[in-house]
């Protein structure tokens, strides 16, 4: 038991070093629970620790004779890691805030920004800024007749830029967004023509990567197709970004916590919902969370 807890604490320290604060805190909470249980077991046998019960206990848990010192050392190490985690979290929050401000400033001045999503890196522009969107098309070499999805911060944004939504839309959004799902709906009059390119529909994305979420919240609705030249592979890793794309983006934020699976695309504009692409979210998951999609094609 003691060796297991020691290994767990080492794992926590590794996660902190990797700046994976959420996972580190989760692992530390689990380990602290184990430490409490360990301490309770020690208290139960404390009176007879050096007798037969104590011998059996030490053998069962594979711990040395000086168990109280070991227990104290484990608790001290857990406390040290909690303080280290808090310090690192504050440092990374400051770094996140700086990067959000830098990306937001670029996007608010008609510039482009490379930001991570769950799937690949995206090349982002302010969706309501025609100059910026035209620049994005030019940099990517994207056909001008190819419409763009809107990256939004909230369900309210989806309602603002769409119309004739199905009654189960809020349930669908609540279950899967933020996340790797694109929802296609009828476009409202609030969607600029340079986004829908004459189409009556528009796709909505809500990325789950923290920095990209915060940038969208700060700037407003963004467009963000994959950060590659048209025809090239989509960049799953920062190293995959082409020099031409990097040169034309004022800001590029690295975060390789991307898992590389395609987004799932669902079209809700017809009488029957259509699954246009099954990606990270499967048909089975959609049906389990939203039974109203039972007739999906």
Model-predicted segments: where are they?
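Short terminal alpha-helical segments
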Residues: 1-13, 78
């Amino acid at each position: 038991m003691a060796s297991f807890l020691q290994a767990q604490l080492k794992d926590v320290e590794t996660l902190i070093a990797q700046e994976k604060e959420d996972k580190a805190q989760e692992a530390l909470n689990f380990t602290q629970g184990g430490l409490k249980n360990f301490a309770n077991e020690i208290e139960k046998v404390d009176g007879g620790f050096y007798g037969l019960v104590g011998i059996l206990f030490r053998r069962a848990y594979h711990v040395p004779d000086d168990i109280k010192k070991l227990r104290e050392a484990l608790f001290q190490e857990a406390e040290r890691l909690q303080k280290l985690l808090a310090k690192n979290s504050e440092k990374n929050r400051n770094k996140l805030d700086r990067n959000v401000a830098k990306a937001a400033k670029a996007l608010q001045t008609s510039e482009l920004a490379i930001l991570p999503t769950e799937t690949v890196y995206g090349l982002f522009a302010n969706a309501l800024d025609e100059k910026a969107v035209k620049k994005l098309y030019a940099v990517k070499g994207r056909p001008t007749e190819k419409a763009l999805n809107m990256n939004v911060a909230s369900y309210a944004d989806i309602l603002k830029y769409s119309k004739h939504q199905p009654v189960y839309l809020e349930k669908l959004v609540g279950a899967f967004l933020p996340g790797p799902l694109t929802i296609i709906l009828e476009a409202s009059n609030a969607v600029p023509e340079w986004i829908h390119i004459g189409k009556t529909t528009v796709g909505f994305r809500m990325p789950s990567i923290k920095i990209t979420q915060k940038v969208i919240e700060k700037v407003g609705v963004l467009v963000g197709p994959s950060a590659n030249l048209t025809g090239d592979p989509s960049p799953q890793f920062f190293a995959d970004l082409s020099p031409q794309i990097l040169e034309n983006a004022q800001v590029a934020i690295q975060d390789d916590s991307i898992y590389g699976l395609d987004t799932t695309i669902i079209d809700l504009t017809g009488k029957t919902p259509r699954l246009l692409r099954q990606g990270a979210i499967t048909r089975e998951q959609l049906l389990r969370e939203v039974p109203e999609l039972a007739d999906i094609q």
